């Protein structure tokens, strides 16, 4: 939920009333942190097919030796197809065939090959027709005000990102709906134009400030010219600012320095951010090669600033690497998590705390990840940070430990997190928790109390209608209120929500493990995907540290094995109780509906 997107304000800025919910959803999903942290929840059918084919081929080629990722991706794709309304309405026969095939266990090489062939022909049929069908479905949902808008918009944005759009660029696109002629043409014109867009040509300029390493008795200037020739052989020309102004008509001269030399990278992209990303990838390949052969000193992406110029419709934008590869803060030094971690790590009498070295090692790798601008380094170091904390002698392998512990840990306070997020959404929409019989300080430092009091409002038959009325100021906030009301009053809705989250996280960890292996063993990187996948790992690590330190403090133990066992058993107790036929579910879930935290043991 973004600040400044309440209904009244948007209508005043020119947005049509029937476009309010769509615009609010679009802006939330394309907010960088929201997308980078939660994108794994909106994987689309075409992406899922590609991933499963990739996993199968990797296994058949001998690059992987277990069925972990194949089984996880098969289950995920099966779930995607079951709930995809586009497949139901437009491609029922393809849907039926896939449901039948994906429901079978892949217990032989021949079945793997058969499924691969089937997925490939299905992809070829969907590739040319799915996007148009999805767009029509989304337009219909917007026009009728259907509840499916959120899921369909998430699928649509996921498809745009798969094509190569950056979410920052997508976010800005929606603002055109406030202006003519896009306002009059409506969302159908806006959406079809975006999904059918063609890549444009960009020239990207990076200052030539490399430190050369002179050889063979050559002067520094002579060897600098040699490096320029090497760059040229890779298709990267070096030009001065004045030379660039000569062939780039319309470029903003203020962005260039006349005598400064620039490395010029030509690329095709949908927007300036993806153009910057692809140019950095291209530069990295060349500069890493030159650095390896000591033609230049080691370099860092963080040292690079870029001037991105659209050569087809003259537009100039200056960017730094941090504008493209940004990370976010998930925990801060004022939190209870920090206080608990400090007590464990502090040298004042706690040097022997069993958890101390585990946390320090994990923090060290997390810092290495944050400090790096190279995607491979960022990803691998944050993965190692999770591995170092999850490693346990109670599991056969490290990935078994991660796949068991992390989903369980992320579910223990999942409801708590949903409530916290709802309160923050209300705050961004200028909703105050002032009711007829009580008031809640939404900025109180005690977040546990804030969550408890907010849940109590939802479950109070007098206050709950007052809260709903306050949330009507923003269409998306009101929709979120309705979702939270169901979660906090209906036992089965809560159970389904938590279990779906657990399953989704487990599927995604398998995906992240595959990416980790490809970087480690094959040097393969999924480029744009790796940017957001790194954010998922930061989020997982922050939650894991929070749970480990919380259980250590609450149970006065430093034994990692005991803490892991407590985390796993708490989730499994919830799982078992939710399935017990004789269980009074409202009674069992009473504590969870009070604090938002699973604390059964």
Regions found by a protein language model. Give the residues of each.
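Charged, non-catalytic interaction/linker regions at domain boundaries
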Residues: 104-380, 384, 388, 531-600
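Amphipathic, oligomerization/interface secondary-structure segments
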Residues: 2-68, 335-601
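N-terminal accessory alpha/beta regions
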Residues: 37-141
């Amino acid at each position: 939920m973004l600040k400044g997107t309440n209904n009244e304000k948007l209508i005043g800025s020119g947005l049509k009333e029937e476009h309010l919910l769509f615009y609010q959803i679009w802006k939330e999903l394309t907010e960088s942190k929201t997308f980078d942290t939660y994108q794994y929840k909106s994987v689309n059918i075409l992406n899922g097919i590609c991933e499963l084919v990739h996993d199968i081929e990797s296994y058949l080629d001998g690059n992987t030796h277990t069925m972990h990722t194949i089984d996880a991706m098969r289950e995920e794709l099966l779930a995607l197809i079951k709930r995809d309304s586009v497949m139901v309405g437009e491609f029922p026969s393809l849907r039926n065939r896939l449901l039948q095939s994906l429901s079978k266990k892949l217990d032989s090489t021949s079945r793997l090959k058969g499924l691969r062939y089937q997925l490939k022909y299905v992809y070829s049929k969907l590739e040319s027709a799915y996007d148009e069908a999805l767009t029509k479905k989304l337009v219909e949902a917007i026009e009728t005000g259907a509840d499916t808008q959120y899921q369909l918009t998430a699928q649509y944005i996921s498809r745009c990102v798969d094509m190569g759009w950056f979410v920052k660029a997508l976010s800005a696109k929606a603002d055109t709906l406030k202006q003519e002629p896009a306002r009059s043409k409506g969302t159908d014109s806006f959406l079809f134009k975006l999904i059918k867009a063609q890549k444009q040509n960009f020239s990207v300029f990076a200052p030539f400030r490399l430190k050369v390493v002179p050889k063979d008795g050559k002067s520094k200037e002579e060897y600098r010219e040699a490096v320029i020739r090497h760059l040229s052989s890779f298709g990267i020309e070096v030009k001065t600012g004045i030379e660039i102004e000569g062939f780039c008509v319309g470029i903003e001269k203020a962005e260039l320095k006349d005598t400064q030399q620039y490395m010029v990278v030509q690329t095709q992209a949908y927007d300036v951010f993806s153009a910057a990303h692809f140019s950095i990838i291209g530069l990295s390949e060349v500069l890493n090669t030159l650095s390896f052969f000591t033609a230049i000193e080691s370099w860092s992406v963080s040292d690079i600033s870029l001037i991105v110029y659209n050569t087809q419709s003259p537009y100039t934008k200056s960017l730094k690497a941090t504008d493209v590869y940004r990370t976010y803060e998930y925990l801060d030094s004022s939190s209870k998590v920090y206080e608990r971690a400090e007590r464990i790590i502090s040298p004042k009498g706690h040097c022997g705390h069993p958890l101390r070295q585990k946390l320090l090692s994990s923090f060290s790798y997390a810092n290495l990840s944050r400090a790096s601008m190279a995607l491979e380094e960022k990803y691998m170091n944050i993965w190692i940070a999770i591995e170092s904390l999850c490693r346990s002698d109670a599991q056969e392998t490290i990935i078994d430990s991660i796949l068991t512990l992390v989903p369980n840990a992320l579910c223990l306070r999942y409801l708590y997190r949903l409530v916290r997020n709802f309160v923050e959404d209300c705050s961004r929409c200028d909703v105050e928790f002032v009711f007829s019989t009580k008031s809640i300080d939404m900025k109180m430092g005690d977040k546990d109390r804030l969550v408890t009091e907010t849940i109590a409002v939802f479950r109070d038959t007098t206050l709950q209608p007052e809260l709903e009325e306050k949330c009507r100021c923003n269409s998306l906030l009101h929709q979120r209120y309705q979702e939270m009301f169901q979660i906090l009053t209906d036992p089965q809705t809560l159970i389904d929500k938590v279990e779906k989250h657990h399953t989704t996280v487990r599927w995604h960890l398998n995906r992240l493990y595959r990416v980790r292996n490809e970087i480690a063993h094959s040097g393969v990187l999924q480029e744009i995907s790796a940017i957001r996948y790194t954010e998922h790992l930061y989020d997982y690590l922050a939650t894991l540290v929070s749970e480990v330190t919380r259980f250590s403090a609450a149970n006065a133990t430093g034994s990692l094995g005991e803490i892991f066992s407590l985390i796993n058993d708490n989730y499994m107790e919830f799982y078992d109780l939710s399935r017990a036929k004789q269980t009074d579910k409202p009674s069992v879930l009473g504590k969870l509906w009070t604090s938002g935290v699973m604390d059964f043991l």
